A protein has these predicted regions:
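Short, exposed beta-strand-loop hairpins at the edges of beta-sheets
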Residues: 116, 124-135
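C-terminal partner/receptor-binding element of secreted or periplasmic proteins
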Residues: 132-144
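Short, solvent-exposed coil/turn segments at beta-strand boundaries
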Residues: 64-70, 91-94, 114-124, 143
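Contiguous, well-ordered beta-strand patches that form the walls/edges
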Residues: 67-109
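Sec/Tat signal peptide C-region and signal peptidase I cleavage site
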Residues: 19-23
């Protein structure tokens, strides 16, 4: 009877151990690839419209490097277009990233941004706001 209980306990431990490993994909411990799926642009009059990532100079794919605290567009000059992750927190099952980007030098196009990544699924929402404009980007992340 004791042997059966020990085998049952060992089996239970084997089942429990892998779950934190799987959940760790979207907690900031591994680099991620983010794909922008839907992009919405809103103006001060309350009108919003769906736009393509290219129409707002947004790459469709980004590498998120948590160790370097950088986000790089994939397939473009990484140093020139990278942005810094200035704040990172785990809140209510979401990894929240925040930062600010100056954009093009000499042009008043800077934005503040926040990205929320669901720890369980990797689905993500990126919001960015600037002068008289706001953007919402729906997408998904996958571990690299």
């Amino acid at each position: 009877m004791i042997r059966l209980r020990l085998i049952g306990l060992a089996f239970l431990c084997v089942l429990v151990v892998p779950f934190p490993v799987i959940a760790g994909d979207f907690d900031g411990s591994k680099p991620l690839l983010f794909a922008a799926i839907d992009v919405i642009e809103c103006g001060p009059n309350g009108e919003c419209s769906r736009v393509s990532p290219e129409s707002i100079a947004l790459s469709q794919f980004f590498k998120i490097d948590f160790k370097k605290k950088k986000i790089f567009p994939v397939g473009e000059s990484q140093e020139k277009k990278s942005t810094t992750i200035e704040n990172m927190e785990l809140i209510d099952g979401k990894l929240i990233l925040q930062g600010a980007e100056d954009g093009v030098e000499g042009v008043r196009d800077g934005v503040g941004w926040t990205m929320a990544i669901a720890e369980e699924t990797g689905k993500a929402v990126l919001t960015a706001s600037g002068d008289q404009v706001g953007f919402v980007v729906f997408g998904a992340c996958t571990p690299l």
